[in-house]
Amino acid sequence: MGAVMGTFSSLQTKQRRPSKDIAWWYYQYQRDKIEDELEMTMVCHRPEGLEQLEAQTNFTKRELQVLYRGFKNECPSGVVNEETFKQIYAQFFPHGDASTYAHYLFNAFDTTQTGSVKFEDFVTALSILLRGTVHEKLRWTFNLYDINKDGYINKEEMMDIVKAIYDMMGKYTYPVLKEDTPRQHVDVFFQKMDKNKDGIVTLDEFLESCQEDDNIMRSLQLFQNVM
């Protein structure tokens, strides 16, 4: 992960918001957009169990109200399907193809595998990515990389993730990436992570390797930049 994530910290892309954490930007944008209105009126449509969400996440009730109103503005039906999710996500990476990575990200948000993401799914993931512990963020990242959800990461899955990130970054990267760069990073990833050399990386191996490597821990911020 250090090789994979560390590499991205050196990539400079001409994106619309190159230095913004997208998850944080979304929250700030919706808060600034709606905060004045909330002073005058209460949110009319809320998900059931707002207090329960407050207990389950790291957001306050007011923050949840802001996020819910923003979510409803973007997704009036109260849920977002994969196609809509891809369209929204693509706006952050106009110079690349974000569709494949958005597909993997959508599956990580869709924890019940229903083909749609509810507000509860969205805000739970956002809470982890913005305010979760290091351990929580690592577990969430592992789940994202574990594409087929079988409990471990193999080389094919890691290769798919890395290629999807490179496609998303597009051709406006510096330094220019060579064709074999993704494979090289995946090989280094497995040299560090696959402790028992059995060709797969388990959650325990992933957590241990990440927390032992300062470079990996510093690069956690990079993941949030493409979240």
UniProtKB/Swiss-Prot annotation:
Location relative to the cell: Cell membrane; Cytoplasm; Cell projection, Dendrite
Annotated tissue distribution: Expressed in brain. Found in a subpopulation of neurons widely distributed and enriched in Purkinje cells of the cerebellum and in the reticular thalamic and medial habenular nuclei.
Alphabetical GO biological process terms: chemical synaptic transmission; membrane repolarization; muscle contraction; potassium ion export across plasma membrane; regulation of heart contraction; regulation of potassium ion transmembrane transport
Region (Interaction with KCND2): 214-227
Protein name as catalogued: A-type potassium channel modulatory protein KCNIP1
Superkingdom of the source species: Eukaryota
EF-hand domain ranges (all copies): 38-94, 97-132, 133-168, 181-216
PANTHER family, A to Z: CALCIUM BINDING PROTEINS, KV CHANNEL-INTERACTING PROTEIN 1
Family: Belongs to the recoverin family.
Binding residues for Ca(2+) 2: D194, N196, D198, E205
Free-text function comment from the UniProt entry: Regulatory subunit of Kv4/D (Shal)-type voltage-gated rapidly inactivating A-type potassium channels. Regulates channel density, inactivation kinetics and rate of recovery from inactivation in a calcium-dependent and isoform-specific manner. Modulates KCND2/Kv4.2 currents. In vitro, modulates KCND1/Kv4.1 currents. Increases the presence of KCND2 at the cell surface.
Entry GO terms, CC: cytoplasm; cytoplasmic side of plasma membrane; dendrite; Kv4.3-KChIP1 channel complex; synapse; voltage-gated potassium channel complex
Gene: Kcnip1
Keywords: Calcium, Cell membrane, Cell projection, Cytoplasm, Ion channel, Ion transport, Membrane, Metal-binding, Potassium, Potassium channel, Potassium transport, Repeat, Transport, Voltage-gated channel
GO-annotated molecular function: calcium ion binding; potassium channel activity; potassium channel regulator activity
Subunit organization: Component of heteromultimeric potassium channels. Identified in potassium channel complexes containing KCND1, KCND2, KCND3, KCNIP1, KCNIP2, KCNIP3, KCNIP4, DPP6 and DPP10. Part of a heterooctamer composed of the tetrameric channel and four KCNIP1 chains. Probably part of a complex consisting of KCNIP1, KCNIP2 isoform 3 and KCND2. Self-associates to form homodimers and homotetramers. Interacts with KCNIP2 isoform 3 in a calcium-dependent manner.
Organism, as annotated: Mus musculus (Mouse)
Binding residue positions for Ca(2+) 1: D146, N148, D150, Y152, E157
Membrane topology label: Peripheral membrane protein
